[in-house]
Amino acid sequence: MTHQTHAYHMVNPSPWPLTGALSALLMTSGLIMWFHFNSVALLTLGLTTNMLTMYQWWRDVIRESTFQGHHTPNVQKGLRYGMILFIISEVLFFTGFFWAFYHSSLAPTPELGGCWPPTGIHPLNPLEVPLLNTSVLLASGVSITWAHHSLMEGNRNHMLQALFITIALGVYFTLLQASEYYEAPFTISDGVYGSTFFVATGFHGLHVIIGSTFLIVCFFRQLKFHFTSSHHFGFEAAAWYWHFVDVVWLFLYVSIYWWGS
């Protein structure tokens, strides 16, 4: 490798953007095939290609940052800006769902019975499973902060314990949400209430699964001593993402479960 006189990471040629684009094409085409012809072969191929691409691409990023030293302070600064912009884009994504919910609920049409929840809809009790879910996510926010502070203080064992607790709470939240969906007295096809409820809470649930996966990767990386108190952006990004998921849930709980019921 030639000597470089700047602090920026000039990435090497990589096949993963190409395989990632191909997997996206296979997944979207596979979804159409599944919807119209009830065949999951193409979708399965797309998902497999996507998983392999993500694994190998992020493996390369870890190699470049942890073992090759390409992630200098300037590069980390750029990654931080990138993560902040990504979270802002996610905030706008969820803003659309809240807009749809409030647009429908603040001025219910005659077709809905002129009331909210619409006539015939029996909403979930906000003081049962949704309240438990809220406390679970708030507790996970505390434990991820404990993990971050432990890492900053160089206390590896406490960091691993706190991270494991956070992951366990994330998995517990997902199971509670799945049971709530299974027992819900309405479906996604029950008018605007069902569609806004399931799309907003469903996308939040997907983000919890993504965040839990992010934290599991951080847990295994910490087992291999990848993070130090001064070099741990991978974990920091996961913590930021988890706090974002927390805050979105609080808005969902207050808007859709509590006020909307």
From Swiss-Prot:
Record EC number: 7.1.1.9
Annotated GO biological process: mitochondrial electron transport, cytochrome c to oxygen; respiratory chain complex IV assembly
PROSITE patterns per the UniProt record, alphabetical: COX3 (PS50253)
Subcellular location: Mitochondrion inner membrane
A GO-annotated cellular component: mitochondrial inner membrane
Chemical reaction(s) catalysed: 4 Fe(II)-[cytochrome c] + O2 + 8 H(+)(in) = 4 Fe(III)-[cytochrome c] + 2 H2O + 4 H(+)(out)
Membrane topology: Multi-pass membrane protein
Alphabetical list of Pfam families matching this protein: COX3 (PF00510)
Membrane topology (Mitochondrial matrix): 1-15, 67-72, 153-155, 224-232
Keywords: Membrane, Mitochondrion, Mitochondrion inner membrane, Translocase, Transmembrane, Transmembrane helix
Residue ranges, Mitochondrial intermembrane side: 35-40, 106-128, 184-190, 257-261
Entry keyword annotation includes Translocase: yes
Subunit description: Component of the cytochrome c oxidase (complex IV, CIV), a multisubunit enzyme composed of 14 subunits. The complex is composed of a catalytic core of 3 subunits MT-CO1, MT-CO2 and MT-CO3, encoded in the mitochondrial DNA, and 11 supernumerary subunits COX4I, COX5A, COX5B, COX6A, COX6B, COX6C, COX7A, COX7B, COX7C, COX8 and NDUFA4, which are encoded in the nuclear genome.
Primary role: Component of the cytochrome c oxidase, the last enzyme in the mitochondrial electron transport chain which drives oxidative phosphorylation. The respiratory chain contains 3 multisubunit complexes succinate dehydrogenase (complex II, CII), ubiquinol-cytochrome c oxidoreductase (cytochrome b-c1 complex, complex III, CIII) and cytochrome c oxidase (complex IV, CIV), that cooperate to transfer electrons derived from NADH and succinate to molecular oxygen, creating an electrochemical gradient over the inner membrane that drives transmembrane transport and the ATP synthase.
UniProt protein name: Cytochrome c oxidase subunit 3
Species this chain originates from: Nanger dama (Dama gazelle)
